[in-house]
UniProtKB/Swiss-Prot annotation:
Role, per record: Acts as a regulatory subunit of the 26 proteasome which is involved in the ATP-dependent degradation of ubiquitinated proteins.
Gene: RPN3A
Region described as Disordered: spans on this chain: 451-488
Gene Ontology annotations for the cellular component aspect, listed alphabetically: cytosol; nucleus; plasmodesma; proteasome complex
Disruption outcome: Short pollen tube growth and failure to exit the style.
Lineage, uppermost ranks: Eukaryota, Viridiplantae, Streptophyta, Embryophyta, Tracheophyta
Name of this chain's protein: 26S proteasome non-ATPase regulatory subunit 3 homolog A
Length: 488
C-alpha cells in the first residue's frame, strides 16, 4: 500500500505538467477556431478577442505546446511551418508525452489556411521568443513576419499586425539595432496610411517617435509627428504612448505648459497595470512642473509602487523647494547614474536656474534690505566673483518679475519692496480658471470615451406607428391562417 502511494506521489508532477499543457493546447485550439470564424465572417472583434486571450496564456507557453500548435494550425512541410518550427526548441521527455497526448486529439488542418491564422502563428512564436529573451531569434522571426505581412492586405489582420510591429521594434531595440529598421517602419507607416489601417498608423507612428527619441533626434520626431495624419484614437495604450512622446518633445522644445498637460494626461489615462510607464510619465511631469516654477504635491511621490523609483526626484524637488544650491548639487551628484539612465540629466541641469530663483525669492521675502555679498553667501555661489554674479542674478530676477525689489548700487545691497495683497491681483482668478478648465476637459474626455449601444441615434417608434405595425402583423397572420385552412 505504501509503495502504491509513493508511486502516485511521484507521478503527480508529471501528470500535472501534462494536464496543464493539454489545457493550454486546448485553449490555443479554441483561439484558432475563433480566428478562423473571424476570418470567414470578417469580424475584427473576434480577432481582437483572440489576441487578448493569447496575452492571458502568455506565461503558460512552452516549446512543446507551440510545436503541437504549429502542427495543428499549419500544414506540415509548408514554408511557414518549416520556418516557425526552426525557432521553437525541442522539448524533453515530459514535452514528448504532452505532444503524444495532444496529437491524439489533434484535428487535421483545413485545406484552406486563413492568412489570419498564419500571421497569428508568427505572433505567438515571436511572443514566446521574447519572453525567453532570445532576441536574436526574435529578430529573425519578426523580420519574416513583416515580410509576410507586406503581401497581405486584409483589415482583419490589422489587430495582429499592430502587435507584430511592436514586437518587431522591441526585438531590435533589445539588441541595440534600432536604427536599422527606421526605413522599414517608415515604409510600413506609408503602406498603412494608403490602406487606411488606422490602428497600424497609430502603432507605427509611436514606434517611429520612439526610434527618433532613442537617438535624441527630437527635430525629426517633431517633423514626423506634425505631418502624420491624425484621427480618433483606436487604442488607449497607443494614445497614452503618443501623449508621453509628445510631452518629451515639448519639454525639449521648452514648451513646458503643453508638455505638462500631455504628460499628466498620459499618466492619468495609462492602465493601472502599466506601472513602469506611469513611473516614467511621473518622472518627466515632476521635472516639467519644477521647470515651470511649481512644486509637485507630496502625494505624487507616495503613490503605490512608486516610492522607491521616485525617491531621487523627491529629494531633487525638496532642494528646489528650499532653494539650496548646495543641496541641489549634492542630490545631482548622488543620483547621477539614475538620472543618466532615465535620460533626464539635461533637464536637471536646467533646474539650477530655478533653484537660484527660489532661493532669491525666499531671501527677498525674509529681508527688506540685504547686501549683495550676503546674497551670494546665502545662495552659495562658488564662482570667481560671487558678488558680481549675485548682482547679475538679482537684476535678471527683477527684470523678469520674479521678485519685487531694487538694487542700491551705491551701498551694494538689494532693497525689497513691501509684499502686496496677492488677492488684489489676477493670480487667484488665473489659478481657478486653470482648475476649472482641467475639470471641464476631463469631463469632455470621459463623455467621449463612453460606449453607447447601437442604433441609439435613431428615433424611437411612436405609438401610432406601433399600432399600425401590430395591426399589419395581425392581418398578415390572419391571412396566412386562412391560406392554411384552404390547403386542407
Amino acid at each position: 500500500m505504501t509503495q502504491d502511494v509513493e508511486m502516485k506521489d511521484n507521478n503527480t508532477p508529471s501528470q500535472s505538467i501534462i494536464s496543464s499543457s493539454t489545457s493550454t493546447m486546448q485553449n490555443l485550439k479554441e483561439i484558432a477556431a475563433l480566428i478562423d470564424t473571424g476570418s470567414y465572417t470578417k469580424e475584427v472583434r473576434r480577432i481582437a478577442r483572440a489576441v487578448r486571450l493569447t496575452i492571458g496564456l502568455r506565461q503558460k507557453l512552452t516549446g512543446s505546446v507551440l510545436s503541437s500548435f504549429l502542427d495543428f494550425a499549419l500544414v506540415p512541410g509548408s514554408e511557414a511551418h518549416s520556418r516557425l518550427s526552426s525557432f521553437v526548441p525541442k522539448g524533453d521527455e515530459h514535452d514528448m508525452e504532452v505532444d503524444t497526448a495532444s496529437s491524439a486529439t489533434q484535428a487535421a488542418p483545413s485545406k484552406h489556411l486563413p492568412a489570419e491564422l498564419e500571421i497569428y502563428c508568427y505572433f505567438i512564436v515571436l511572443l514566446f521568443l521574447i519572453d525567453q529573451k532570445k532576441y536574436n531569434e526574435a529578430k529573425a522571426c519578426s523580420s519574416a513576419s513583416i515580410a509576410r505581412l507586406k503581401n497581405v492586405n486584409r483589415r482583419t489582420i490589422d489587430v495582429i499586425a499592430s502587435r507584430l510591429y511592436f514586437y518587431y521594434s522591441l526585438s531590435y531595440e533589445q539588441t541595440g539595432d534600432l536604427a536599422e529598421i527606421r526605413g522599414t517602419l517608415l515604409a510600413l507607416h506609408h503602406s498603412a496610411t494608403l490602406r487606411h489601417d488606422e490602428l497600424g498608423q497609430e502603432t507605427l507612428l509611436n514606434l517611429l517617435l520612439r526610434n527618433y527619441l532613442h537617438y535624441n533626434l527630437y527635430d525629426q520626431a517633431e517633423k514626423l509627428r506634425s505631418k502624420a495624419p491624425r484621427f480618433e484614437a483606436h487604442s488607449n495604450q497607443q494614445f497614452c504612448r503618443y501623449l508621453f512622446y509628445l510631452g518629451k518633445i515639448r519639454t525639449i522644445q521648452l514648451e513646458y505648459t503643453d508638455a505638462k498637460e500631455s504628460l499628466l494626461q498620459a499618466a492619468r489615462k495609462a492602465p493601472i497595470a502599466a506601472l513602469g510607464f506611469r513611473i516614467q510619465c511621473n518622472k518627466w511631469a515632476i521635472l516639467v512642473r519644477l521647470l515651470l516654477g511649481e512644486i509637485p504635491e507630496r502625494s505624487i511621490f507616495t503613490q503605490k509602487g512608486m516610492e522607491k523609483a521616485l525617491r531621487p526626484y523627491f529629494e531633487l524637488t525638496n532642494a528646489v523647494r528650499i532653494g539650496d544650491l548646495e543641496l541641489f548639487r549634492t542630490v545631482q551628484e548622488k543620483f547621477l547614474d539614475t538620472f543618466a539612465q532615465d535620460r533626464t540629466h539635461n533637464l536637471i541641469v536646467r533646474l539650477r536656474h530655478n533653484v537660484i530663483r527660489t532661493g532669491l525669492r525666499n531671501i527677498s521675502i525674509s529681508y527688506s534690505r540685504i547686501s549683495l555679498p550676503d546674497v551670494a553667501k546665502k545662495l552659495r555661489l562658488n564662482s570667481e566673483n560671487p558678488v558680481a554674479d549675485a548682482e547679475s542674478i538679482v537684476a535678471k530676477a527683477i527684470r523678469d518679475g520674479a521678485i519685487d525689489a531694487t538694487i542700491d548700487h551705491k551701498n551694494g545691497c538689494m532693497v525689497s519692496k513691501e509684499t502686496g495683497d496677492i488677492y488684489s491681483t489676477n493670480e487667484p482668478q488665473t489659478a481657478f480658471n486653470s482648475r476649472i478648465a482641467f475639470c471641464l476637459n476631463m469631463h469632455n474626455e470621459a463623455v467621449r470615451a463612453l460606449r453607447f449601444p447601437p442604433n441609439t441615434h435613431k428615433e424611437k417608434e411612436s405609438d401610432e406607428k406601433r399600432r399600425e405595425r401590430k395591426q399589419q402583423e395581425e392581418e398578415l397572420a390572419k391571412h396566412m391562417a386562412e391560406e392554411d385552412d384552404d390547403d386542407f
